[in-house]
């Protein structure tokens, strides 16, 4: 055959192949919309969740069945289908997205199982923008990228939705300074989700800049704490930045953290943590003018608190920048997102390696950092969005209360005599067999010459209410002629609720732990007693969040076994009431037995 004919037929074949590819692509894309994307056909991982990592099968739609080419990786085809499902522009700037039709049904069904709309997540691009929610003053900051310490970002995952994990990775790559971001270390804590195996390896190998992402796979599930230690051991950056596997960063969130550690290597830093809705993926904030810092509750749980006025005054005195963007001291940290000098992390004791699973490690590190000479600071110009779920979709090994057991270990080492208040709130942990030996952590405290928990409360968190100090009485508020006690009925203390009545427990329980303060406030740990404004009975006792200044909390008096509300002059009364009824006040009657109460201590 003459050369010109060979050339002609060659071009014709290429033209036909291109035309076929275009027709196939058009069929896949037709009828697509942000509300109801086309179902990706053809090659799929078998179930793609909960099966062996290497099992694949052919998938066919009503019209086509396409065999897997022998020369092409099956993961490439699957990843291409994943990318086809994504809708460019969907959810950009962090706006909410609402699915409809079959996609909504799929999303709702998945949400019931894992508390996250994975159907929607798969339609959002991995590198979507979430907007710039920083204080405008932050944009004026300048950092010398050549002199910033380098960062190793450590992300632990266990059966994290594939698309959510990759969005965390891509967000980190696109929002952190390229020179400063040395590496991202993904630690697989024993996942059995097929997508997180060889498919993830292939994606990282083919679509992430070489050397930027390392995947460390643990043979057995170790839990968050030990998995983080495994990641930290192989990190090579100057700074460790720990992130949860479901985060998206704001513009320039890394640099302020690295700059502050450059200035103060014993400062442990947390960004402002914004909320990404687990259902519609909306990125929301409380604005840039105010933010909260970390506190704790006496039952060992982390708590958010408003920035104390005392801290605002310290910022004005000590900070050279505008106060709104100054580092703010935080008594504790949530623990999911923070930055720490890598060498200091090991010097100050890293994590308690005998803690299992998850929970308690954040307060342990918080108290340890403060008591041993460091600081915990919130950096206002660093903002990261985090998906908060309604429930935890994964069980912990052996269904143990790892949070409670870990917190008890923490309390034994760091809380000194205040451990008694912890056990008042968690009596079930006082003699728990699984707490284990804490000798090596006590030795660490001695080695580091750390301060007392009394010092911590006095100097770092003086706003924290101590139920047994500066009080006229504390414990159960017990009716004299009945086995009935004042009780919070386990209600949500983040908003006002009606106090109630309940049979007195043999052992003091958290729900019946009240204090009558020296400033005449009747309260529990977080809420103060008031009386509902009403034109007629019943006059209910309402618990409202306490004000930092006791002058603004309503006053009560305790006289001759009567608990009297100062504003109304009425007395706490259980006449005609039974268990689970709302607590009430009534006009005082010195002869009424139902108005007589004792305070336990």
UniProtKB/Swiss-Prot annotation:
<keyword id="KW-1015">Disulfide bond</keyword>
<feature type="binding site">
    <location>
        <position position="189"/>
    </location>
    <ligand>
        <name>substrate</name>
    </ligand>
</feature>
<keyword id="KW-0430">Lectin</keyword>
<keyword id="KW-0479">Metal-binding</keyword>
<feature type="binding site">
    <location>
        <position position="244"/>
    </location>
    <ligand>
        <name>Mn(2+)</name>
    </ligand>
</feature>
<comment type="pathway">
    <text>Protein modification; protein glycosylation.</text>
</comment>
<feature type="binding site">
    <location>
        <position position="358"/>
    </location>
    <ligand>
        <name>substrate</name>
    </ligand>
</feature>
<dbReference type="InterPro" id="IPR035992">
    <property type="entry name" value="Ricin_B-like_lectins"/>
</dbReference>
<feature type="topological domain" description="Cytoplasmic">
    <location>
        <begin position="1"/>
        <end position="7"/>
    </location>
</feature>
<dbReference type="GO" id="GO:0006493">
    <property type="term" value="P:protein O-linked glycosylation"/>
</dbReference>
<dbReference type="GO" id="GO:0000139">
    <property type="term" value="C:Golgi membrane"/>
</dbReference>
<keyword id="KW-0735">Signal-anchor</keyword>
<keyword id="KW-0812">Transmembrane</keyword>
<feature type="disulfide bond">
    <location>
        <begin position="571"/>
        <end position="588"/>
    </location>
</feature>
<feature type="binding site">
    <location>
        <position position="392"/>
    </location>
    <ligand>
        <name>substrate</name>
    </ligand>
</feature>
<feature type="disulfide bond">
    <location>
        <begin position="485"/>
        <end position="504"/>
    </location>
</feature>
<feature type="binding site">
    <location>
        <position position="221"/>
    </location>
    <ligand>
        <name>substrate</name>
    </ligand>
</feature>
<keyword id="KW-0464">Manganese</keyword>
<keyword id="KW-0328">Glycosyltransferase</keyword>
<dbReference type="GO" id="GO:0046872">
    <property type="term" value="F:metal ion binding"/>
</dbReference>
<feature type="topological domain" description="Lumenal">
    <location>
        <begin position="29"/>
        <end position="601"/>
    </location>
</feature>
<feature type="disulfide bond">
    <location>
        <begin position="138"/>
        <end position="381"/>
    </location>
</feature>
<dbReference type="InterPro" id="IPR029044">
    <property type="entry name" value="Nucleotide-diphossugar_trans"/>
</dbReference>
<protein>
    <recommendedName>
        <fullName>Polypeptide N-acetylgalactosaminyltransferase 1</fullName>
        <ecNumber>2.4.1.41</ecNumber>
    </recommendedName>
</protein>
<dbReference type="InterPro" id="IPR045885">
    <property type="entry name" value="GalNAc-T"/>
</dbReference>
<dbReference type="InterPro" id="IPR000772">
    <property type="entry name" value="Ricin_B_lectin"/>
</dbReference>
<feature type="transmembrane region" description="Helical; Signal-anchor for type II membrane protein">
    <location>
        <begin position="8"/>
        <end position="28"/>
    </location>
</feature>
<feature type="region of interest" description="Catalytic subdomain A">
    <location>
        <begin position="148"/>
        <end position="260"/>
    </location>
</feature>
<dbReference type="GO" id="GO:0030246">
    <property type="term" value="F:carbohydrate binding"/>
</dbReference>
<feature type="domain" description="Ricin B-type lectin">
    <location>
        <begin position="472"/>
        <end position="600"/>
    </location>
</feature>
<feature type="binding site">
    <location>
        <position position="389"/>
    </location>
    <ligand>
        <name>substrate</name>
    </ligand>
</feature>
<dbReference type="GO" id="GO:0005794">
    <property type="term" value="C:Golgi apparatus"/>
</dbReference>
<dbReference type="GO" id="GO:0005795">
    <property type="term" value="C:Golgi stack"/>
</dbReference>
<feature type="disulfide bond">
    <location>
        <begin position="528"/>
        <end position="546"/>
    </location>
</feature>
<comment type="function">
    <text>Catalyzes the initial reaction in O-linked oligosaccharide biosynthesis, the transfer of an N-acetyl-D-galactosamine residue to a serine or threonine residue on the protein receptor. It can both act as a peptide transferase that transfers GalNAc onto unmodified peptide substrates, and as a glycopeptide transferase that requires the prior addition of a GalNAc on a peptide before adding additional GalNAc moieties. Prefers the monoglycosylated Muc5AC-3 as substrate.</text>
</comment>
<keyword id="KW-0808">Transferase</keyword>
<dbReference type="Pfam" id="PF00535">
    <property type="entry name" value="Glycos_transf_2"/>
</dbReference>
<dbReference type="InterPro" id="IPR001173">
    <property type="entry name" value="Glyco_trans_2-like"/>
</dbReference>
<feature type="binding site">
    <location>
        <position position="246"/>
    </location>
    <ligand>
        <name>Mn(2+)</name>
    </ligand>
</feature>
<keyword id="KW-0333">Golgi apparatus</keyword>
<keyword id="KW-0472">Membrane</keyword>
<feature type="glycosylation site" description="N-linked (GlcNAc...) asparagine">
    <location>
        <position position="127"/>
    </location>
</feature>
